[in-house]
Amino acid sequence: MQIKTYKIKDICDIKRGRVISKLYIKNNPGEFPVYSSATVNNGEIGRIKDCDLKGEYVTWTTDGAQAGSVFYRNGQFNATNVCGILKVNNDEIYPKFLAYALRLKAPKFVNYACPIPKLMQGTLAEIELDFTSKKIQEKIATILDTFTELSAELSAELSAELSAELRERKKQYVFYSDYLLNPKNWK
């Protein structure tokens, strides 16, 4: 099996999104997602009527507490100026595999020495990753997709179970607090 090592700058076009304010989102509602530095809701901060990007991309959070977070995007969307954008320009690279590989490596390159953590274009461009054949990249990405889905399902189920358990414990607490603090029950 042949392994090739590439710097991000050698396999991707690298850019950042544009400034899209909350006011712009409010005044231009539409169907196309706007991704920012947030990681909640998959990074989506709203939807607008226009679309800057179409196709398969990898995005990353450039600034803030979640700097270095990496996402695979496929479809029509927009990205703000605190969202870096990678467009694969090498036929040997599967974008989703790139996203998974970069997700592991990018956080190691975040600059925490600044007041606001950053992972800028120049730094990301120099990150080196190893790649196998595109066919194997696709298989690996499919396996990781399955694990990601199972993990999300399990998290949702556990969250629901824990919430239900917590509600029951709170009911018990109220019941026993009322009982134990009632002077009639102190006999």
Swiss-Prot record:
<comment type="subunit">
    <text>The methyltransferase is composed of M and S polypeptides.</text>
</comment>
<dbReference type="InterPro" id="IPR044946">
    <property type="entry name" value="Restrct_endonuc_typeI_TRD_sf"/>
</dbReference>
<comment type="similarity">
    <text>Belongs to the type-I restriction system S methylase family.</text>
</comment>
<comment type="function">
    <text>The N-terminal section of a specificity (S) subunit of a type I methyltransferase (MTase); this subunit dictates DNA sequence specificity. The single R subunit has multiple frameshifts and is probably not expressed.</text>
</comment>
<dbReference type="GO" id="GO:0003677">
    <property type="term" value="F:DNA binding"/>
</dbReference>
<protein>
    <recommendedName>
        <fullName>Putative type I specificity subunit S.MpnORF289P N-terminus</fullName>
    </recommendedName>
</protein>
<keyword id="KW-0238">DNA-binding</keyword>
<keyword id="KW-0680">Restriction system</keyword>
<dbReference type="GO" id="GO:0009307">
    <property type="term" value="P:DNA restriction-modification system"/>
</dbReference>
<dbReference type="InterPro" id="IPR000055">
    <property type="entry name" value="Restrct_endonuc_typeI_TRD"/>
</dbReference>
<dbReference type="Pfam" id="PF01420">
    <property type="entry name" value="Methylase_S"/>
</dbReference>
<dbReference type="InterPro" id="IPR052021">
    <property type="entry name" value="Type-I_RS_S_subunit"/>
</dbReference>
